[in-house]
């Protein structure tokens, strides 16, 4: 018993440092899985150990005989001597910040349709893995105008890699690379500029191999420091729409859609390093609420190839839609055999359109021997001409037609994976069904997903079904109506559980994950990869599954000789991540008249506070729109357990606006985030005594009583806003708070997020700000903010601090030099926990 107690206490003591060193216990865990080909193979990323941040590319294989294996395809340290140095382009750093990517090495990859070739970058250098050959080679890009290499995407046919430099869209012909280029040699003629940023309000420039490439390079070079970008997602798309791509291959590899945007109308913001007064501030464009967005354009590029399949030239067409009314390009989807789909939104996100883009006929390149010539090496150069089809008015490539329109009085949600065509041409879209209070899917305009299954994400669309992540609303879909596989744990399949299900177009559905938790899936052919975790496992799980056919002539369990059988092979992918060394002591409950989903984390059984009669309460919410923290996933409560073992009853309550409970619940905060989200946290506090008494009665185990005279709140981002708000506007309930990166003034946040909830009326922003509340402060408040935060600028905390100073209100401010919206420094992350602990201990005496 003594040894166990010491071990538990050691784990709690070591948690802050261990969490920081392991990137929140993610190092060594497999991630980013994708089933490929017939499903017998699956790609994934994983680093070598629990404190190794450098991720490698791996493949899981299930053989026809059911044997399984994990194969290392690409190790950054083998491919690059300086792989640990983490020298990536600034644009890539920005993309990773948008995606909250903290790893290094190979952090993303692109695979062709057959699952044979994989493209990726390491420290800004381009690489290609040929899976069948078992070879990974570097593609050296030496010419300055062809760099940096950003967002490489391999063509579906595996013959080309397209990437962007931000100024140019660049094609790499892999036939030329494979034949002529070794890893250390410049790719040379294999690399071509296919399009550049526009110049002087001209159309996008496509390379036509007739001398205009030089003009494109010359014009674009003049604007390299300008405001136009090509092939990249603008800030609002990456930060708020979860759209990180800025160009898209057609399934037949004959077209590319690419984005260009002009950020010159956006506000110019500056990120400074106050610790180094000699270092100039970095200027960047930011889509500040109630100001102009980037001007986003889309271009359809028809690609021409020579007889060797190498890029020869192209024809660019502007994609036309009502950009003045629908300025947000929210999603792009392209299904084989069909036109590409766009989802565009208006400024307030109350109206959207699903558009089909006409692509026309693929261009034909014809040999033009009369234009042939001999190059300086004496080699004959074959030349080609491009045949340009004629189209009737309104049918030209780049024209669009409206397939569906949607509207909502508050806002329309973006559901990842929609819109999409089924292979046979039916249109699948998302629907906020207010009458059914369910986020649903439609096929050709008709809802088909069940009432009470809140669709969170679409993972795959076939002619037979849609694979999606859902959350059940028990009030709308009772346990008696659930499939057999969920009957034994029906009470846990609710808003806390992100479940993968298959839903057919007649409304029938079946669960593909049975254990409540946070799950996702990738499928291909007869195989799939399931990734996620529940409450029982400290480590995330990844399982590669494949239906394997028995060989002809097998006999088993009375099955006749020669009959075909299918058996499921499940291959767990190894996880090398660290674990905290303790299991959170979590009790789920519902709080208050609104039945808020809540997690109560009590001191561990071995803690010195386990048998305390009464303990202070620490509210630890996010509490804002679009994100939940009460989830059936153990990792959500590790921080909370550390706090509980410092002597607190820790409570996380998901109030109105958090996802998973239907569109009406989400929209209860519309134009009134501040008051509604605080009210729910106050209600949670006062509902806590009865909830704890009920827990004690049900379990037969005594639990500490909550000391409602000593209630504190901590949080980050929206949780930071809520924490500061708690002590400003509800000091009778909350005795102290630590507010990390709080958006104190919503006019300083971005357009797409903020205007969705607050609209465009300045009075609404003033009502939801907490700057004017500064004179009310009568409780201890700690503000924490990173100077390098390009998401929630430190100006938010500085303005609140200035207002507090002007009002003569004592407070603590921890400005963090070099820290972004992620606390990505080991020492800082560790010490932040300890400093907050000590601050609250003093404040609650």
Identify what each model region corresponds to.
Residues 411, 798, 805-845:
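C-terminal catalytic histidine-bearing segment of alpha/beta-hydrolase fold enzymes
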Residues 680, 735-736, 741-779:
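Mobile cap/lid helix-loop segments that gate and shape the active-site cleft of serine hydrolases
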Residues 777, 783-785, 789:
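Short beta-strand/loop motif that positions the catalytic acidic residue
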Residues 32, 54, 107-108, 119, ...:
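Non-catalytic accessory segments flanking enzyme active sites
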Residues 1-501, 505-510, 516-517, 845:
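Beta-propeller folds
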Residues 791-799:
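Conserved alpha/beta-hydrolase "acid-adjacent" motif
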Residues 571-710, 714-722, 729, 744, ...:
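Cap/lid segment of the alpha/beta-hydrolase catalytic domain
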């Amino acid at each position: 018993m003594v040894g166990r107690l010491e071990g538990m206490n050691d784990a709690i003591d070591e948690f802050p440092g261990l969490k920081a060193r392991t990137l929140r216990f993610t190092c060594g865990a497999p991630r980013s899985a994708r089933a490929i080909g017939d499903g017998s193979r699956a790609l994934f990323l994983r680093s070598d150990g629990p404190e190794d941040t450098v991720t490698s590319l791996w493949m899981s294989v299930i053989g026809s005989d059911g044997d399984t294996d994990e194969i290392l395809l690409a190790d950054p340290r083998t491919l690059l001597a300086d792989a640990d140095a983490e020298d990536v382009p600034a644009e890539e750093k920005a993309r990773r910040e948008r995606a909250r990517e903290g790893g290094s090495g190979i952090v993303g990859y692109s695979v062709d349709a057959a699952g044979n070739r994989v493209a990726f970058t390491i420290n800004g250098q381009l690489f290609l893995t040929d899976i069948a050959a078992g070879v990974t080679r570097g593609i050296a890009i030496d010419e300055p105008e062809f760099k940096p290499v950003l967002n490489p995407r391999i063509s579906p046919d595996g013959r080309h890699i397209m990437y962007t430099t931000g100024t140019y869209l660049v094609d790499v012909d892999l036939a030329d690379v494979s034949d002529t280029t070794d890893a250390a040699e410049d790719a040379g003629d294999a690399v071509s500029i296919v399009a550049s940023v526009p110049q002087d309000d001209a159309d996008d420039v496509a390379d036509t191999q007739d001398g205009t490439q030089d003009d494109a390079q010359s014009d674009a070079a003049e604007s390299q420091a300008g405001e136009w970008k090509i092939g990249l997602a603008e800030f609002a798309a990456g930060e708020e729409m979860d759209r990180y791509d800025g160009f898209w291959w057609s399934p037949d590899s004959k077209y590319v859609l690419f984005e260009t945007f002009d950020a010159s109308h956006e506000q110019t913001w500056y990120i400074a390093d106050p610790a180094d007064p000699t270092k100039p501030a970095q200027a960047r464009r930011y889509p500040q609420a109630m100001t102009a967005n980037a001007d986003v354009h889309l271009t359809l590029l028809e690609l021409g190839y020579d007889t060797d399949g190498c890029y020869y030239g192209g024809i660019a067409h502007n994609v036309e839609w009502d950009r003045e009314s629908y300025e947000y390009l929210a999603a792009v989807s392209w299904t084989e055999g069909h036109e590409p789909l766009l989802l565009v939104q208006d400024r307030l996100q109350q109206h959207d359109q699903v558009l089909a883009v006409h692509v026309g006929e693929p261009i034909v390149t014809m040999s033009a021997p009369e234009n042939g010539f001999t190059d300086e090496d004496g080699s004959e150069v074959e030349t080609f001409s491009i045949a340009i089809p004629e189209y009737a008015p309104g049918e030209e490539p780049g024209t669009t037609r409206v397939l569906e329109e949607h509207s909502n009085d508050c806002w329309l949600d973006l559901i990842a994976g929609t819109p999409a065509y089924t292979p046979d041409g039916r249109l699948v879209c998302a629907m906020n069904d207010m009458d059914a209070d369910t986020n649903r899917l439609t096929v050709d305009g008709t809802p088909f997903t069940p009432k009470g299954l809140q669709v969170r994400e679409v993972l795959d669309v076939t002619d037979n079904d849609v694979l999606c992540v859902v959350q059940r609303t028990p009030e709308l879909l009772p346990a008696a109506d659930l499939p057999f596989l969920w009957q034994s744990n029906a009470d846990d399949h609710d808003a806390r559980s992100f479940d993968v299900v298959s839903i057919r177009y007649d409304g029938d559905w079946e669960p593909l994950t049975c254990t409540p938790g946070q799950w996702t899936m990738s499928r291909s052919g007869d195989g799939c990869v399931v990734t996620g975790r529940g409450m029982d496992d400290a480590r995330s799980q990844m399982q590669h599954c494949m239906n394997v056919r028995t060989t002809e002539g097998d006999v088993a369990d009375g099955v006749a000789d020669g009959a075909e059988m299918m058996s499921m092979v499940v291959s767990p992918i190894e996880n090398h991540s660290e674990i905290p060394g303790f299991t959170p002591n979590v009790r789920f409950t519902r709080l208050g008249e609104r039945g808020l989903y809540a997690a109560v984390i009590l001191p561990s059984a071995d803690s010195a506070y386990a048998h305390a009669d009464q303990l202070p309460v620490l509210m630890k919410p996010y509490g804002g729109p679009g994100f939940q923290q009460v989830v059936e996933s153990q990792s959500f409560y590790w921080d909370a357990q550390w706090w509980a073992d410092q002597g607190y009853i820790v409570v996380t309550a998901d109030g109105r606006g958090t996802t998973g409970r239907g569109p009406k619940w989400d929209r209860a905060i519309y134009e009134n985030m501040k008051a509604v989200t605080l009210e729910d946290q106050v209600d949670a506090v006062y509902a806590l005594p009865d909830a704890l008494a009920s827990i004690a009665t049900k379990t037969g185990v005594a639990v500490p009583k909550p000391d409602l005279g000593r209630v504190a709140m901590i949080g980050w981002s929206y949780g930071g806003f809520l924490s500061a708000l708690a002590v400003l506007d509800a000091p009778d309930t909350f005795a102290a708070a630590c507010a990390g990166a709080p958006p104190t003034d919503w006019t300083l946040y971005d357009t797409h997020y903020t205007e969705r909830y607050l609209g465009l009326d300045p009075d609404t922003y003033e009502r939801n700000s907490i700057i004017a509340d500064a004179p009310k402060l009568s409780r201890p408040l700690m503000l924490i903010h990173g100077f390098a935060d390009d998401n929630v600028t430190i100006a938010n905390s500085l303005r609140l601090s200035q207002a507090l100073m002007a009002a003569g209100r004592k407070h603590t401010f921890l400005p963090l030099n070099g820290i972004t919206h992620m606390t990505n420094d080991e020492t800082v992350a560790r010490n932040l926990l300890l400093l907050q602990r000590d601050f609250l201990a003093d404040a609650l005496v």
